[in-house]
Amino acid sequence: MQALPVDIHHVSFSRKGAYLCITGRNEAQCRDNPHLHIRPGLWLRNFHDEGRRDVFLLEPVRDGAALPCTPELSPDELCLRVDGGGTVRLCLSAAETLRIRVEGASLRLSMLAHLGGGEFRIGANAWRVNCPGALRDYTICSVTGSVAVDRARRDERDYVDVSVAPSGGATAAEAVLIQSKGQAELPETWPAYESARQAVRDDFEAFHRRNADVPPELADTARLAAYVNWSSFIAPCGNMTREGMLMSKNWMGNIWSWDHCFNGIALAEVDPDAAWDQFMVIFDHQLETGQIPDMINDTTLQYNFLKPPIHGWAYDLMMRLNDAFSAPDRLETAYRHLSRWSLWWLAHRDPDGAFLPQYHHGNDSGWDNGTVFDIGYPVQGPDLAGFLVQQMDILA
């Protein structure tokens, strides 16, 4: 499959539904995020709970020495072309499963030891690595070749090293890594690597085909845009009552309660069911008072901030884009949620009865740290009043 023209430091390797991704970290990112305790390189990341944990540093190795490589990212595979020969191929065959194939080199996956809670052999060809820092277990098993786990000290840090390497005179090896909540159940056999890769490719192509046609000169850009959207989805889990589109699998690993509207608008014409899920994923957590959370991920619901009531405007636009959103059942559901959301602003953010609701923080407006809030709080923003008037007009 054709590689995408992207820098993995800016666009992560992932797939639709996955809670795993691989991201490049450069010197500046490591320096600006000392709390991550990471160093430059390619990191396998856990994207539960906002994607806050870089778990394994991935390095092609030969004779114990890390080798420079060139990453080539396509929707179905991340291929690391090793300087001097050899490849490491990585495929996310499922939401929590990474297939690994090495040829002419080995792969070292290094976890910072302070994140770990022990590593244990659980079979002739499988290891379990407990990572309290990510609140997850990692099971690594060999399909061909060998998997070994050891501890090592490099660059003044202690690591738990997992090595995937050819054995018995072979030049290639395959392994599988599973991220799980609790110990993973392993199948007796695994599908061939190329079969797993083909299934991912088919899933992406089906998603891409639903997108609007573009002129030939924009085809590569449209394919990249489709990949970014496709790979930003996470599967239902915990608070994620539906398949949801994150803002990014780089740094913004949540769904905020106005960004979800833009995701719904973007999908409305080409995939109305997915667009409906994006619109509703926030309203699934609406309180009895009518308030909705500021942001959600699979483990967190944040209610101490808000976002402005653009939801009526967004749903009206979605109806204009696709008649599917005017279906009676969807219209009734949207009306119920939007009515309660509108009334909440008047009941809880209009203490002086002026019918001019208030922002209590910059985050409530989406302007976050805008200088307009230097005057202090509360702020009766004309944009807020305008959004609410428009939402109530649409409801009427």
Model-assigned labels for residue ranges:
Residues 1-217, 250:
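Terminal accessory carbohydrate-recognition/targeting modules of carbohydrate-active enzymes
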Residues 1, 86, 94, 253-261, ...:
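Short, charged low-complexity intrinsically disordered segments located at boundaries
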Residues 121-123, 266, 314, 390:
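Active-site-proximal flexible loops/turns
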Residues 14, 235, 350:
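Acidic surface patches and DE-rich sequence motifs
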Residues 208-320, 331, 339:
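Substrate-binding groove/exosite segments of carbohydrate-active enzymes
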Residues 189-192, 196-199, 203, 217-224, ...:
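Extended, well-ordered alpha-helical scaffold segments
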Residues 43, 127, 159, 190, ...:
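A residue-identity detector for tryptophan
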Residues 160-189, 289, 294-310, 324-326, ...:
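The feature captures the catalytic groove of carbohydrate-active enzymes
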